[in-house]
Design a protein with these regions (language model features):
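Bacterial Sec-dependent N-terminal signal peptides
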Residues: 1-28
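Phosphate-group recognition and catalysis centered on beta-loop-alpha active-site segments
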Residues: 18-284
Length: 284
């Protein structure tokens, strides 16, 4: 009886916490994978490069994902490269130095050599954290209900990434990022069951994407790092295609200077996801 009461209390507290959250929470899907999970009660915050500007927590780092998850952030954009051993790993830069100790082009290094280095935070401080393997990040996110937007470094095999996502049973928790129509079509061919982020900054780009034959329910629209015309957000909402606004850079700086209330104003245009370097700033 006592155990039942405690379990009920914990579930109730969880529901209240979600309702009181300042950002949107993604509702998991089990069987059918559609973009409707991103139409939450409130806009969803997605941490660019898995979290930037946080002392002691580097970008593209599993421990940063774990830290932000505890703070209520559950969507993360990460960058994928491949070592000479064929292991998929996380890093944005082509070379070591800025975000990790050591020197060298990461795609020309072995996994063993890369794992010897340590990640640095955005302030140049060395941490004890290793460059993460994608499989470890996928496994943790699967277990803890975190969602990933996967950005491919040049030359990465789409099918290899898709196979690893499937192996870790993360198909329902990823978005594959494309930057042009041909890339979107290629991703759809190798992973038709997964969601795909497509660049849609205007009506013309929307029309070209709709002509590809990619299922509409698999699309997530990246509308750029500047505000698009209000009519585009209206149209995307009519089509039930969730939109991402990349506030990273210019718009984040504007909000920092003029006030974080701007995120809420932008959300009212019909934006479902904010990709930001300031994950704690947006409040909805």
């Amino acid at each position: 009886m006592k155990k039942t009461f405690l379990l009920s209390l914990l579930l109730l507290l969880g529901v209240v916490a979600c309702k009181n959250s300042s950002t949107g929470q993604i509702t998991p899907q089990k069987d059918v994978i559609t973009n409707q999970i991103y139409f939450a009660e409130k806009p969803i915050v997605s941490a660019h490069r898995a979290g930037k500007g946080i002392a002691g927590y580097p970008e593209n780092c599993l421990q940063t994902i774990q830290y932000l998850s505890k703070k209520g952030i559950h969507s993360f954009e990460i960058d994928i490269f491949e070592s000479t051993d064929g292991d998929l790993m996380l890093m944005h830069d082509d070379k070591l130095g800025r975000t990790a100790t050591g020197q060298g082009v990461v795609s020309q290094m072995s996994t063993e050599a890369l794992l010897k280095e340590r990640l640095k935070d955005d302030f140049g401080k060395e941490t004890n954290f290793q460059i993460p393997l994608l499989k470890d990040v996928l496994a943790w996110c699967k277990q803890h209900g975190a969602y990933l937007m996967l950005d491919f470094k040049k030359g990465i095999s789409y099918s290899k990434v898709a196979e690893l996502v499937r192996a870790e049973q993360m198909q329902t928790q990823v978005v594959l990022i494309s930057y042009n129509v041909e890339q979107a079509k290629a991703l759809y061919r190798v992973a038709p069951e997964m969601l795909i982020s497509v660049t849609i900054r205007n009506q013309s780009e929307l029309d070209r994407i709709l002509e590809t034959g990619i299922e509409r329910e698999k699309l997530v629209a990246f509308t750029g790092v500047h505000l698009a015309d209000d009519s585009l957000y209206k149209k995307l909402n009519e089509l039930r295609i969730p939109s991402i606004l990349g506030t990273l850079g210019n718009l984040d700086k504007r909000a920092e200077a003029r006030g974080d209330h701007l995120y809420k104003e932008w959300a009212q245009k019909g934006i479902q996801i904010f990709s930001t370097d300031r994950p704690f700033a947006p409040k909805f």
